[in-house]
Amino acid sequence: MPNTRVAAERSPSVTLRFMASPTDVLHHGAQGVSGGRVLEWIDKAAYACAAQWSATYCVTAYVGHIHFTRPIPSGHIVEVRSRIAMTGRSSMHIVNEVLSADPREGVFTRACDCLVVFVAKDPDTGKSMAVPSFVPTDDEERRVAEAAESRIGLRKAIEKEMEAQTYTDDSTAPRIVHRFMAKPTDVNWGGNVHGGTAMEWIDEAGLACTMEWSGERTVAVYAGGIRF
């Protein structure tokens, strides 16, 4: 029987589900899944949303406004809802909501939300590609689009201030250096480490730094922004 080609619908939203397993909990005694693993799940769902909309290869450009509102226990079903908020010439601003539920109850409640920006790339040249414009169709979509657009100026102002700073080793601030080996499974078909994997590494290093300084167990509650 010959294969039949079916055109994929260009939808502005994607929902992926994951099962939170014991191996997703970073250290013994933690109340739930590590923040880095949650960010990895978000990156996968947001990538699926971006690739579906643009119909091409995409790369993570920015992740920010990350709010962790509660821990996700091992054994929960995790649902990541990603949708286009607005588009630029080659960029797609995607809002993401993470919810989880005890499978015995099936009641999903929010655990995290954040914004991810992807850029569409030509898989052959690596240059950015134009994407279809997203036009909000109702009041809620317009509200989300306006909120996403309002953050652009703030991000640029922060980046400008950071570029003007001079960073040296003359500091008493606590610091820690972690090294990771990028495995073949960490690399996407474009030849680069997945953005979600890089975010998981950042979370692990941050966790080690805060626990060493405080002498207590710590959890991620907020991340202002990660630019790739």
Give the positions of each predicted feature.
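Short amphipathic alpha-helical face segments that pack within enzyme cores
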Residues: R37-W41, A45, T197-W201, A205
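Short alpha-helical basic/polar micro-motif
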Residues: E40, H76, V80, D124, ...
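N-terminal, Lys/Arg-enriched amphipathic/low-complexity engagement segments
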Residues: G29-V33, V38-K44, A51
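Generic secondary-structure boundary/loop-capping signal
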Residues: P22-T23, T60-H65, T69, S128-V131, ...
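Catalytic strand-loop segment that frames the active site of acyl-thioester-processing enzymes
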Residues: M1-V33, A145, E149-W201, A208-G215
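Conserved GNAT-family N-acetyltransferase fold
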Residues: I42, I66, N96
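Hydrophobic beta-strand-centered segment that forms part of the acyl-chain substrate-binding groove
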Residues: E9-S11, A46-M92, T109-C114, E204-F228
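HotDog/MaoC-like acyl-thioester-processing domains
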Residues: N3-R5, E9-R17, I72-I77, A85-I158, ...
